[in-house]
């Protein structure tokens, strides 16, 4: 099993870590997008995008995040203020923060989890941890999530605000005590890419430990790979239904990442997002066969919301080449593309490559 993880590493390092939409492809679509009818999704995607603020400069992260949240030209309209965090894992690979909207009564809250940062090898472990299942510790027998998802969840729960030292649990308990028992505040949990996958398991934890008694939860994930098996997803669905909570999985149909890890065959059948190079085709076939052989059957959680597709205008490499494929993958997965497809204003920050990734 460990040997096969190197195939994952090869695929992700060859394709994902070198995928940089440095050409700044404009989004070409005739559809106004989900965001025109769902401002919640636009706000959550904006918060997810801002989780990448100064990801390689943690000393400036908090101040930069406050500046970005204050901007009135974003979908967040300057209404959301930093209330907890940013919190970082020891190696800096994971980041999470919480905000509140004081323009409504009771206040609304949101937790945003950062996606994959290829500058931090620990993120590779969380992405590549899909090669084995671990029991989901807050569910029942048979509820399993990827090893990477469990590692990531444990990190999120252990992380503390870089200024106050408060954990997420301490923060949630604090704001819970500020409201009467009869009043529930809205809580949003969101993330993009790996952040979306971690937002899924964090949302399950949130309900499983009883926070639905204080908050009305709505989860929005964007471009998220799947987190667990069918039993976990059934548990996820049950606890959301019991809590009268909502979970939306927002995807660009031409984004490669949401097909991981349960719909890999569809990547080949649909040539997602464009003509697959032979090496990518071969590795995905091998990965799919491996998951089937070892009964690692992944299922996506949440209500599917499919965005309109978009076409990059500056990916002009030969069809079937690795360069062309990387260009399409980067464009379709980027936070700026998701914001555009939602009809939301662009942010100044989003998922960006490390210096060593730039070509």
PLM regions and their residue ranges:
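Surface-exposed intrinsically disordered loops and tails
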Residues: 58-87, 133-175, 271-285, 289-290, ...
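Short, solvent-exposed loop/turn elements at domain surfaces
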Residues: 55-57, 119-122, 258-259
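Serine-dependent carboxylesterase/thioesterase catalytic core
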Residues: 173-260, 264
